[in-house]
Amino acid sequence: MAADEEPDSPSGALQTAAEEEETKTFKDLGVTDVLCEACDQLGWAKPTKIQIEAIPLALQGRDIIGLAETGSGKTGAFALPILNALLETPQRLFALVLTPTRELAFQISEQFEALGSSIGVQCAVIVGGIDSMSQSLALAKKPHIVIATPGRLIDHLENTKGFNLRALKYLVMDEADRILNMDFETEVDKILKVIPRDRKTFLFSATMTKKVQKLQRAALKNPVKCAVSSKYQTVEKLQQYYLFIPSKFKDTYLVYILNELAGNSFMIFCSTCNNTQRTALLLRNLGFTAIPLHGQMSQSKRLGSLNKFKAKARSILLATDVASRGLDIPHVDVVVNFDIPTHSKDYIHRVGRTARAGRSGKAITFVTQYDVELFQRIEHLIGKKLPVFPTQDEEVMMLTERVNEAQRFARMELREHGEKKKRKREDAGDDDDKEGAIGVRNKVAGGKMKKRKGR
């Protein structure tokens, strides 16, 4: 066969298809010029795999089921077709996006507003934890896009005079598997009954569970499936490790890793709100720029933590699983599972915070004597044996005394904070990220810890 005919071979054809995918632009997908310019301004040089799959079909008016790994550009895959359609037929209350969490709702709103800034797109975020009256006023202005959690949206549909979605053209269910796992099925059913049947529906999910399949049958008409990753797959450029350590030395090993990989951004997952707060205080006492994000914080403080981390004002975000899905934090270099997830699928979503959209990243999971069975389930789920993260145990043990001292002061601060909350429920200050307790931190032997350069 001649050299110029080589693409006719199976391997040559695959290579050509991959090269074509690499060179595709948003314009090639059918996105209008004004939105292509918005993509350029956001630094979206080229579409991701899920965008290449989903956008042309969505622009043809098809219902879409999008299955893609976390961090694959799912928001752009549904936002661009919706904005494209809005440009052609401008209308208020044009699209509804349902999400499982408040944080994800704000993230999606930011992307819609950024992409649609030049065409004057107006969004309303309708979530719990925020005053209903201000949301009612926002809905009265009839925004183009409503981004909502199901529970609060039902509240407004039932109680906000004059608000309805009878003219809705697009419905998006993002992180649909999680919406259903959080027992929002009843609310979703109610919403489906009060919106037009003649609409376009996009369902995006990390996994195709039985509940999602049931929802697909109820909500979508002749949908096209766009899948760019297999079930429970972790992204290719993610380096995954584990550390088998005694439970009592978890804090010490965490400090060692933060020093060894200094200069990176970290997302550290803890199992409880209390442990998240305690570990954040411990790390601050040792001079690290750590900030917590958990469900016991107010909505404004949670968004404050998230924004400081996104702006790189803080390099370490400690979070419960409330932050493990859907949040747009593109610069996480290392994920640490400080507490191993109880549900194996949560491992996929946690480590999906790094190695996003083609970048590389590390994930390190702490395994104690109590976690062996959970860890084996994770390895079985992802279909691979993880290597051990290399450590120098002698160097780790040298940190023990100072870490123990920082632990004591962290516990003291937690107690003081708890007593203060009892005395004064309304706390106007930003206790979750103030640089206070300076006296306590200065007592930690040696002050700030010397950090090594990252590997």
UniProtKB/Swiss-Prot annotation:
EC top class, as a word: hydrolase
Motif (Q motif): 24-52
Main localization, broad class: nucleus
GO molecular function: ATP binding; ATP hydrolysis activity; RNA binding; RNA helicase activity
Annotated Helicase C-terminal domain residues: 237-397
Domain (Helicase ATP-binding): residue spans on this chain: 55-226
Stretch list, region Disordered: 1-21, 412-455
Location in or out of the cell: Nucleus, Nucleolus
Binding site for ATP: A68, E69, T70, G71, S72, G73, K74, T75
Presence of the UniProt keyword Nucleus in the record: yes
PROSITE patterns named in the record: DEAD_ATP_HELICASE, HELICASE_ATP_BIND_1, HELICASE_CTER, Q_MOTIF
Gene Ontology cellular-component annotations: nucleolus
Enzyme nomenclature, EC number: 3.6.4.13
Coiled-coil annotated residue ranges, if any: none
Biological-process GO terms, alphabetical: extrinsic apoptotic signaling pathway via death domain receptors; mRNA processing; RNA splicing; rRNA processing
UniProt xrefs under InterPro entries: DDX47/Rrp3_DEADc, DEAD/DEAH_box_helicase_dom, DEAD_box_RNA_helicase, Helicase_ATP-bd, Helicase_C-like, P-loop_NTPase, RNA-helicase_DEAD-box_CS, RNA_helicase_DEAD_Q_motif
Sequence motif: DEAD box, positions: 174-177
Protein task: Involved in apoptosis. May have a role in rRNA processing and mRNA splicing. Associates with pre-rRNA precursors.
Family statement drawn from the similarity comment of this UniProt entry: Belongs to the DEAD box helicase family. DDX47/RRP3 subfamily.
Protein name, UniProt field: Probable ATP-dependent RNA helicase DDX47
Organism the protein comes from: Mus musculus (Mouse)
Gene (name only): Ddx47
